[in-house]
Each structure stands twice: as C-alpha cells, then as structure tokens.
C-alpha cells in the first residue's frame, strides 16, 4: 500500500507582501508635486494721487507699462498691469466716459503700435478750433460766389469741417477736465482754459457757453437764412455776431463756395442762383466779409 506524498506547508505559494512606504514614495516621485500657492506680499492699495498719475500716464503712453511705471514712480509694472486690468473692467461694466487704450498688436501685426509722445508733451485732450483767414485786402484764395477760378479737383466735405469744429465740444478726460484751445479775436493766436467736470454738472440746467466754441445754432441759422427769400438784414446780423461765430460763418461759406464750384454740382448752383436772396443779399455779405478782413489786417 503506497503512501500519499506529504504536504509541506512551506512549498505552498505565499501571497505578495504589502507595499511599503518607501515603494509609495518611489512611485509618487515620478509625478511633479504642485507647489502650494502662497501670497508672499500683501496687496498694496493705491492712493488717489497714484491713481491720478496712472490715468494721466494712460493718456500719454497707452499700454506702454514701462513708461507708465516710470511716470507713476511708486508702483511696479506687475502692480500697474493688475490695477489697469481691474480699472478697464470697471470702466467697461459701468459704461463711463474714460480713456481705455486699445490692446497692443502682435509683434508681426500689419499696423504697428503708434509711437507716443514723451512725458513732457502735452496731454492729447487739447483740441484746437483756430481758424485761418487771409489778411490782405485782395483776399487771395477767396473767390466771389460765381468765380470760376474756384474750380477744384476735390470737394471739401462739410461733415469733415463740422467734425473739426465740434472737436472741442466734448472730450472729458479721466480727471473730469475739459481742455479747450480757442482762437483769439484776431484769429492769429490761441488761449487755453480748463473746465472741471463738477462745474459742468452744476451748470447742467443752463446751456454751458464755452469760450472758443462756436454757437452752431446761430451759425447754421444764418447760413440757411441766406437762401430764405423772406429774410433780410444779413449784414446787420453778421456785424452783431461774436468773433468766433463770424470766423465760423466765413469758413463754412468758403467751403460751400468750393463745393458749389465743382462741375458735378452745376445744376444745384444754378438753382441757388435763381433765388432772389442769393443775388441781392449775398453780395453784400461777401463785401462785408472782405471789408472786415481788410480792417483786421490794417
């Protein structure tokens, strides 16, 4: 009778040992451990003076952060960019009237970023409404209503002239200031004054009268009345105008003369010349303009 082989417990397969802590560390070392985020420096608040300098630097340098840093003087580029981002979002959310420079284009953009002026340059809020007029008696360059020498190859757009004249009406800067350059009564110089935003608010119930800004209602009412057969006394009205309105009428009448001298507007010119006022009132107005110019140049 044969005996069955004896079972030896040592020959049985042993279960794998549990992983040790050293194995876990070796496996985890293959993955990059993310460094915890810590605020190493407390956020610095901006004083009102620093914020005003920041707004002024935006007007001068747009998004040139290095120049803005030099202009502010007490903040780094990182702090300025963070402050600018929050400021731009606030302006966009509130819809306030403020200068937000366009984003800088990429390096290979077709239109590179325009070069800004230096610190010592004036802020670009200043607008000029000076009018240039000829000062000799013959007024070269100024033609009478039917002078054929005024035929030009281009037509000056009245909208362009209007946009130029209205440039001083509303551009309130970041500090609530309106800087207006106005021509002198002689038309040869200019003066500048500053209007605060609070002053504009206080006078909201009254139409603000800014020196150097023409009264466009009076100007265009006068020009329109030249073609009204029921209206007389244009010379007297022109004499009573303020110098700035007088210069504006002169500028627009010259522009109108140039446009109507274009051959494409010959039919319109003939219709206007058929009005009684154009043949009776307008020559006296033109004569007064010439005489006034001669008096100023004397």
From Swiss-Prot:
Protein known as: Protein REVEILLE 8
General function of this protein: Transcriptional activator of evening element (EE)-containing clock-controlled genes. Forms a negative feedback loop with APRR5. Regulates the pattern of histone H3 acetylation of the TOC1 promoter. RVE4, RVE6 and RVE8 are components of the circadian system acting synergistically to regulate flowering time, redundantly to regulate leaf growth, and antagonistically to regulate hypocotyl elongation; their action seems independent of ZTL and HY5.
Domain HTH myb-type: 38-92
GO cellular component: nucleus
Organism of provenance: Arabidopsis thaliana
PROSITE patterns referenced in this protein's UniProt entry, alphabetically: HTH_MYB (PS51294)
Induction: Circadian-regulation. Peak of expression in the afternoon, and lower levels in darkness. Down-regulated by cold.
Keyword Transcription attributed: yes
Anything else known: Subject to temperature associated alternative splicing producing mainly non-productive mRNAs.
GO molecular function, one term: DNA-binding transcription factor activity
Keywords, comma-separated and alphabetical: Biological rhythms, DNA-binding, Nucleus, Transcription, Transcription regulation
A Pfam family of this chain: RVE6
DNA-binding region: 65-88
């Amino acid at each position: 009778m044969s005996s069955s082989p004896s079972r030896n417990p040592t020959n049985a397969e042993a279960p794998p040992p549990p992983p040790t802590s050293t194995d876990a560390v070796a496996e985890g070392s293959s993955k990059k451990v993310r460094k915890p985020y810590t605020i190493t420096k407390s956020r610095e608040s901006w004083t009102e003076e620093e914020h005003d300098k920041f707004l002024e630097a935006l007007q001068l340098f747009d998004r040139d952060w290095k120049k803005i840093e030099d202009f502010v003087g007490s903040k780094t580029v990182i702090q300025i960019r963070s402050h600018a981002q929050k400021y731009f979002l606030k302006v966009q959310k509130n819809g306030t009237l403020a200068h937000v420079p366009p984003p800088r284009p990429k390096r290979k953009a077709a239109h590179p970023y325009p070069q800004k002026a230096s610190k010592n340059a004036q802020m670009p809020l200043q607008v000029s409404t000076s009018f240039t007029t000829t000062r000799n008696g013959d007024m070269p360059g100024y033609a009478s209503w039917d002078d054929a020498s005024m035929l030009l190859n281009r037509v000056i757009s009245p909208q362009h002239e209007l946009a130029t004249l209205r440039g001083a009406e509303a551009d309130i800067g970041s500090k609530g200031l309106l800087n207006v350059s106005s021509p002198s009564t002689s038309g040869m110089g200019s003066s500048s004054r500053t209007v605060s935003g609070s002053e504009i608010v206080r006078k909201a119930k009254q139409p603000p009268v800014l020196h150097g800004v023409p009264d466009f209602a009076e100007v265009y009412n006068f020009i329109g009345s030249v073609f009204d057969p029921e209206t007389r006394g244009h010379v007297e009205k022109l004499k009573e105008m303020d110098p700035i309105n007088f210069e504006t009428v002169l500028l627009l009448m010259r522009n109108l003369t140039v446009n109507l001298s274009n051959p494409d507007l010959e039919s319109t010119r003939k219709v206007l010349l058929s009005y009684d006022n154009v043949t009776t009132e307008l020559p006296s107005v033109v004569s007064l303009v010439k005489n006034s110019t001669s008096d100023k140049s004397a």
